[in-house]
Amino acid sequence: MSDLKLSPLVIKLGGAALDCAETLSKLFGAIAQYQNQAQRRIVIVHGGGYLVDDLMAKLQLKSVKKDGLRVTPYDQIPIIAGALAGTANKMLQGQAIKDGINAVGLSLADGGLCHVEELDPELGAVGKATPGDSTLLQAILATGAMPIISSIGLTAQGQMMNVNADQAAVAVAGALDAELVLLSDVSGVLDGKGHLIATLDAKQADALIAGKVITDGMIVKVKAALEAAQDLGRPIEVATWRYPEKLAKLFGGESIGTRFLP
C-alpha cells in the first residue's frame, strides 16, 4: 500500500454517529488530525436513516424496509431528500466547520459524480449509483476542502432518488479510484459466537448469509463492501466509529474491523 497517501480516501459515515454531537466532534477531530498529518484528500459520504425515521414518525408515515433497503414511495422522496441532502448534510457540514474543517456539502448528482437509476420498481424511488465524472470533486479536493456528500442522487430525467449510503460510497470511491472505509455502529462482521471476523471474501460471506449469521441491513453492507472490493480491486474495511482514537490507524491502512477481500 505504498500509494496510500496519493489516493484519496472515501469515508462512509452512518448509523447513530449522526445522532450525537459529541461523537461527531471526536470523529471530525480524528479525521482533521489525520488529514493534516497525512496530507491526504478525504471525502465523506453519509446516510441518515434515523433522521428519516424520526421525520416519517412525526408525519405519521410508515417506514418499510425490503431486504435491508428502505422502500421509498415516489410521493415521499421530497421528504426523504430533505432529511438527507438537507438536514443530515448541513448538520455534518456544520460540525466539520466547527472543528476547523473547510467542508463543502454535495449530493451524488453534483458535477455528474454518480449516474443513478431506479434499482427495483418495488422499492420506489430507490436508486442504484454507478461511478460518473469526478472532475468537479477533484477540483474541490484540490482546494484542500473536504466534500461531504449525501446519498441522494438524480436520474438522467432529473428524478430524485434515495441511494443506500453504503452503495453510494462505493460509487463515489469508484469515480475517484479511492480507498474506501465504511464506518458504522458495529465493529465489523461478527460470527455466530459474536466474535469479529478479521477478513471475509464472497464465498465466506455467502455461507454466513445462507446460515442466517449475517442478516437484514448487514447483508446490504456486506454486499456493498464485497462489490467495492471487486470493482476497485482492493480490500475494503468495515469498522466502527465508536473509537475515534483508533481511526488514524485505520485511515493509515491498519485493519481494526472486518477487511473485505476482492
From Swiss-Prot:
Keywords: Amino-acid biosynthesis, Arginine biosynthesis, ATP-binding, Cytoplasm, Kinase, Nucleotide-binding, Transferase. Pfam families: AA_kinase. Its EC number is 2.7.2.8. Substrate binds at G48, G49, R70, N162. It is an enzyme of class 2 (transferase). The record marks K12, K221 as: Transition state stabilizer. Pathway: Amino-acid biosynthesis; L-arginine biosynthesis; N(2)-acetyl-L-ornithine from L-glutamate: step 2/4. It catalyses: N-acetyl-L-glutamate + ATP = N-acetyl-L-glutamyl 5-phosphate + ADP. One of its GO terms (molecular function) is acetylglutamate kinase activity. CDD domains: AAK_NAGK-NC (cd04249). One of its GO terms (biological process) is L-arginine biosynthetic process. InterPro entries: AceGlu_kinase-like_sf (IPR036393), AcgluKinase_fam (IPR004662), ArgB (IPR037528), Asp/Glu/Uridylate_kinase (IPR001048), NAGK-NC (IPR041731). It is found in: Cytoplasm. It comes from the Bacteria. Its main location: cytoplasm. GO terms for cellular component: cytoplasm. Belongs to the acetylglutamate kinase family. ArgB subfamily. HAMAP family: ArgB (MF_00082). Catalyzes the ATP-dependent phosphorylation of N-acetyl-L-glutamate. This is Acetylglutamate kinase.
